[in-house]
Design a protein with these regions (language model features):
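Interfacial loop-to-helix junctions that mark the boundaries of transmembrane helices
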Residues: 5-11, 33-43, 160-170, 208-210, ...
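Membrane-interfacial loop-to-helix junctions in multi-pass transporters
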Residues: 41-43, 72-86, 115-127, 212-216, ...
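Juxtamembrane and boundary regions of transmembrane helices in multi-pass small-molecule transporters
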Residues: 2, 161-207, 342-382
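Membrane-interface alpha-helices at helix entry/exit sites of multi-pass transporters
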Residues: 78-83, 116-130, 158-168, 319-331, ...
Length: 382
C-alpha cells in the first residue's frame, strides 16, 4: 500500500501536494456548503473541453500532418531547427504549451538523430530547451494558451483583446530573443553537411487519411469553445456537446484528458477557499502582496509552479493583470516553474538518463537569461 502511494506521489506530485494541502486546511475550516462556492466550474468545464478537443485533433493526426508539410517546405538544418521552435511558440497559443511540447519535442528528437552525429549532439539539448521556452512564452499571449491564463482571464473579466494587448510586448520580445538564440547557436554549430529532407528522413511514416468526421466535429467544438472564452455562450453548452460527442462517437478520447490537472485545480480551489476564511492568514498574504503582485507571482511560481501560484494568489488580490504577467514570467526559471517543462525533461531522461544533468544546466541558464529580459521589460512597462 505504501509503495503504491509512493509511486502515485512521484507520478502525480503536484496533485498529491494539492490534495494534502486541501485536507490540512479542513482542520481549520470544516467542510460545509460554502465549499461549493470555492470551485470555478466555468474554468474547469472549459479546461476539460479544450483538453478533450486538442487530444482528439492530435489523435486524428492533424498536428503531424501540419508539421510534415511545413518541414518539407523548409531548407537547411537551421531552417528546420527554427521551424521546430516556432511551431512550439505559435501553436502553443492555441493547443496549450504542454500539448505543443508533447507533439513537437519527439519530432525534434527524431530529426536530430537524422543529423550527422557531431551536429546532432550539438543540437540535441539546445533544441529541446528552446522548444520548452518557446512553448511557455508563446502560450502566454492567449486566454487558452495555458491553464493559468484561462483561469485568471475568467477571474479578471477581461476580453481576449485586453489579455493579448497586455502580454503582446512580452511575447514579441520572447520571439525576438528566441530567433537571436537560434542564430547565435547556429553560428557556433559544427560545419558539416546539411540535413537532406525527405519524408522518411524527417521521421514521418505514411499515415492513413484523416478521419474527416472527427476533424470536422472537433473543429466545430473548438469554435464553440472559443465563443465561450469570448463569453458569447455559456460554458455548459460546449461541455455538454463535447461529452455527448465523445460518448456517442469517440469514447477512446475520454481517457486522453488530463484528469489529474482537473483534480489539482479542485484541490487547490478548496485549499485557497479555506485560507480565505482564516482571517490571520488572509490579512498576512494581502499585506505581503500589496503592490508586489507580479514579483510575488514570479517567486511563488519557482517553488510551486505557475498554475498553483495563480490559483493561490488570486484569492488575495484583485490585481489579476499583475498576476497574469507574474505567473507567465514565473513559468521561466526552475524546472518546476511551469509543469510543461517537466514534459521536455522526461523526454530527455528517456532519451539518455546521463544527459539529465547537462540538460538541466542548459535549461536553467537559458531560462534565467530569458527571465531577466522579461523582468527588465516588466519594470520598463509598469
Amino acid at each position: 500500500m505504501l509503495q503504491k502511494l509512493y509511486v502515485f506521489f512521484r507520478k502525480e506530485t503536484v496533485l498529491s501536494i494539492a490534495v494534502i494541502l486541501a485536507l490540512l486546511s479542513m482542520f481549520w475550516v470544516r467542510p460545509d456548503k460554502a465549499y461549493f462556492t470555492y470551485i470555478d466550474f466555468r474554468t474547469l468545464g472549459l479546461l476539460f473541453c479544450l483538453m478533450a478537443i486538442v487530444a482528439g485533433l492530435k489523435a486524428v493526426g492533424v498536428f503531424d500532418i501540419l508539421a510534415q508539410k511545413l518541414l518539407m517546405g523548409t531548407s537547411g538544418t537551421v531552417g528546420v531547427i527554427r521551424l521546430l521552435v516556432l511551431l512550439c511558440f505559435f501553436l502553443s497559443m492555441v493547443i496549450t504549451n504542454d500539448v505543443a511540447l508533447i507533439t513537437f519535442v519527439p519530432l525534434a528528437l527524431i530529426i536530430v538523430h537524422k543529423l550527422p552525429k557531431e551536429l546532432g549532439n550539438y543540437w540535441l539539448l539546445k533544441i529541446v530547451a528552446m522548444q520548452t521556452i518557446a512553448a511557455n512564452l508563446g502560450s502566454m499571449l492567449t486566454p487558452i494558451g495555458n491553464p493559468q491564463n484561462l483561469y485568471l482571464y475568467a477571474r479578471a473579466g477581461m476580453s481576449a483583446a485586453e489579455l493579448i494587448t497586455l502580454m503582446l510586448p512580452y511575447s514579441a520580445t520572447a520571439l525576438i530573443l528566441l530567433l537571436i538564440w537560434i542564430q547565435v547557436a547556429a553560428a557556433k554549430a559544427p560545419h558539416v553537411c546539411s540535413l537532406e529532407k525527405d519524408k522518411t528522413l524527417l521521421g514521418f511514416s505514411d499515415r492513413k487519411e484523416l478521419n474527416m468526421e472527427y476533424l470536422a466535429a472537433y473543429l466545430i467544438l473548438f469554435t464553440i469553445c472559443l465563443l465561450t472564452v469570448a463569453r458569447i455562450i455559456p460554458y455548459q453548452i460546449p461541455l455538454v456537446l463535447v461529452l455527448i460527442y465523445m460518448l456517442l462517437r469517440n469514447r477512446e478520447n475520454i481517457s486522453r484528458v488530463d484528469y489529474s490537472l482537473l483534480a489539482t485545480f479542485i484541490a487547490l480551489f478548496i485549499f485557497i477557499g479555506n485560507l480565505g476564511r482564516i482571517p490571520q492568514f488572509s490579512s498576512f498574504l494581502e499585506r505581503i502582496m500589496a503592490g508586489r503582485e507580479t514579483l510575488t507571482a514570479v517567486l511563488a511560481s519557482q517553488i510551486m509552479s505557475n498554475v498553483p501560484a495563480a490559483l493561490l494568489l488570486s484569492g488575495f488580490t484583485d490585481n489579476y493583470r499583475a498576476l497574469i504577467v507574474g505567473t507567465n514570467i514565473g513559468g521561466l526559471g526552475t524546472l518546476i516553474a511551469s509543469m510543461a517543462s517537466l514534459i521536455s525533461f522526461k523526454y530527455i531522461a528517456k532519451e539518455n538518463r546521463n544527459l539529465r544533468g547537462k540538460y538541466l544546466g542548459i535549461f536553467t541558464a537559458s531560462n534565467i537569461i530569458f527571465m531577466i529580459f522579461m523582468l527588465i521589460l516588466y519594470f520598463f512597462l509598469r
